[in-house]
Amino acid sequence: MLIGEKSIEENKKKMLERKEVYKQYGYDQDASRNFILEKSLPLRLPILEIGTGKGHMTALLAKQGVKVITVDNSLADQEFARLNVAAEKVLDSVRFALFDAAQLPYPDQGFGTVVSVNAFHHFEKPFAVLGEMIRVCREKIVIADFNQEGFEIIRKLHRDEGHEHEEKCGDFSLVGQYLKGYDFAVKKHDGCHQVVYVGERKK
C-alpha cells in the first residue's frame, strides 16, 4: 500500500500534538517506550509484536535495525500505525498482520522475542493471548502495561475528553507467575508509568 508524504506529515503533526497533551498530564510517551525497550534488550530474532496499536513501539523496535512482524485485530489501528512507522523511515522493516492474537497462525517457538506493550488491558481473553505468546516464543517474552499511576493518568485524560478509557478484566499482576508456570525466568520492572515483565525461557 502506497502512503503519500502529505498523509505521513499530517499524521506526524497530530501525533506530536497528542504527545504534548500526554506530557501535560505527566506522562512522557517516549520515555515510557524507551524504558520498555531498555528492559527488552538484547532482542532475539525474529521479533513478533502482539497489539500493533498506533505503531509507536513497532517503529521503535524496527529502529533497532531489526525486522518486525506486528499483529493486531484492528485494520483501522494498523492503518494509523503504517503512517507512524513510515514517519520513522522504517516501513520496509515491518510486516503488518491482521489476526486474532488468541489464535496465532505461527509455529511453536517460531520467534526469538515476542513483545506486547500497553495492549493487555484491551484483550478480551488476555490469558489466551499470553498462552499464544508463550507457544510461539523460543527465547524471550516482553509484556508491558501501565502501572497504577499510569492508568490513573490515562483515565483522567480520557474522562477530561468526555469518555472512559477501555479496560477489560485481565489481572496483569498475574503475568509473572503465569510465565514462571511455563518455565520462564522472570524479571519485573516498574518505572516510567509502566510495569514490564521480561520472561526468558529456561534452557
Predicted feature descriptions by range:
Residues 119-122:
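A short His-aromatic
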Residues 54-103:
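Class I SAM-dependent methyltransferase SAM/SAH-binding core
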Residues 46, 67, 95, 110-112:
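Structural signature of beta-strand start/N-cap positions in the alpha/beta core
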Residues 115:
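A conserved beta-strand element that flanks and buttresses the S-adenosyl-L-methionine
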Residues 1-42, 44-53:
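Conserved class I S-adenosyl-L-methionine
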Residues 19-26, 57-59, 71, 142-198:
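C-terminal alpha-helical "lid/dimerization" subdomain adjacent to the S-adenosyl-L-methionine
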